[in-house]
């Protein structure tokens, strides 16, 4: 069984788009870039399949099924030989693709103002400026109470927190999802976060949900997929080496292996610009009646993918509920961080927003780093593509993700990335190489998210 892209269809689309040149510039760009990128991912997966002589999928022998079932809750103790497996791609590979995005219509002069953009992203998408961001994130203002701010001048922190907890309990009692979303814009009390997030995401963990999770688990037990080894490898390379998350290794395997089998995830491709990859029964290449999506959820994991799940393990200890929360977070938010699109929360827009904020409000720093070959996006991209998971301390990361849920937007990731550069600007102005700049920004674990965001948006920038 081999993966194959439907090149005939892609070519037809490209030809149609060319004839409509000018009518949908961003769509044209997205389709061409996506087609090329998806083809590259499939080629990487196919090459691994061929080199290792491993099928994309196989049914496990009964003995192997029993063994996996017995060790389901302690898969972290398993040490399979993964030395020959490699991630299909890493964030830096994806950044190279985004850097090469071009729109010839704009390069011919349609939008001369964009020529002043000296960053790595050369796609003229509309992104918000500071006044618009202030308006969008008004609840982060200096005069608004926030969890994660220790020295509010308006209300003593303990008084705000006590009242905030009381309001949060009322929101939970009323089971009002919209009220919960508004509430978490000021941060979630630790004791209420799990329930509030579940309310916002409409996760109730009913018996049928638990049964569905068990069915996915059964599918994992019965069938072995090539992507299972990619998941194992990713967990071993990332979460297993993280001081915060290594204890959740078993949870990560369970959730991610089940996720790969979940065909309901395919539904998000109706609003995700990407195309789920297909495999064909051997000898039936290109015959649609013999095609299936591979993996079944249509999502090929990349290096760092498991870090989307890891922070959630602090909040949810019931595997089926943890699974549902992650799946909903993925189809609402995380897929946008590794998909090429012009959506305001898509990774291309986030990169452009980050670069625009730095170039506009910290021009000296931006130009200095650019001149020494340390384009800021080369450093910040990995933070944004993982939603800062694995970079911030967990308590700070959860405060950040509160706001992602509250504002139903990932734009705050770009704002925080710019705020980090602003915070370390003095040290960064002294560096003379990319390696030195990376060293200055190597450890974000001591940073306090909310003060950084407030200062950047509402205090130092006008």
Give the role of each language-model region.
Residues 5, 9-12, 21, 25, ...:
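Alpha-helical interaction elements in eukaryotic regulators
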Residues 16-19, 71, 97, 117, ...:
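Alpha-helical recognition domains of nuclear gene-regulatory proteins
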Residues 130, 139-160, 166, 171-174, ...:
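Extended, Lys/Glu/Leu-rich amphipathic alpha-helical scaffolds
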Residues 142, 155-352, 362:
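Alpha-helical repeat/alpha-solenoid scaffolds of the HEAT/ARM/MIF4G superfamily
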Residues 194-199, 297, 301, 382-383, ...:
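Hydrophobic/aromatic-rich, well-ordered segments within soluble, folded domains that form packed cores
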Residues 254-257, 290, 306-314, 324-328, ...:
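Contiguous, well-ordered alpha-helical segments that form the cores/surfaces of helical PPI scaffolds
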